[in-house]
Amino acid sequence: MDAPLFLSGQFLLAMPGIGDPRFDKAVIAMCVHDEEGALGIGLGRVTPRIGFHDLLKQLDIAPGEAPNAPIHQGGPVEPQRGFILHTSDWGGADSIDVAGRWVLSATLDILKAIAEGKGPRRWVAALGYAGWGGGQLEQEMRRHGWFVTPGDENLLYESEVDTRWGNAFRSAGVDPRLLTAESGTA
């Protein structure tokens, strides 16, 4: 029997016609995936009304040296909960290494470190996450809802939000314009 394929440290790309507008052109950085379920942070959209400085001020943290970076819409689950995906040069007590590709942190410590100029070299912020129960993601993948690509650091930290989905497909050698939501038999 083959070992199960877990997707931590990879990107999920929504296939055209995924059928859920919340995930249209979604790029999800997978952080946890095992037999009990999966958790990923969406990187395909940003929140229109709040930047990183606004978030810090709401938490009574002076922005200091932090850039006023966009806040990504991490997903529909717990949209008020904040997450930072970042390089491994910073780690807090509750930080989670994700397959050696990036680190996930969700405490005030990382926000304070970023504001003080002592945080990770590269990072992205998000509110909410995408979550799946045990076997749920696998079912969606069998229905051709998602495409998997390696967790490329450049796509995570450097790609512009509105081009990230297409760039991720192209980095895998796939032209997303040629994809369809329909399946057939030969």
What is each stretch, according to the model?
Residues M1-A125, Y129-A186:
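A short aromatic-anchored loop/beta-hairpin motif
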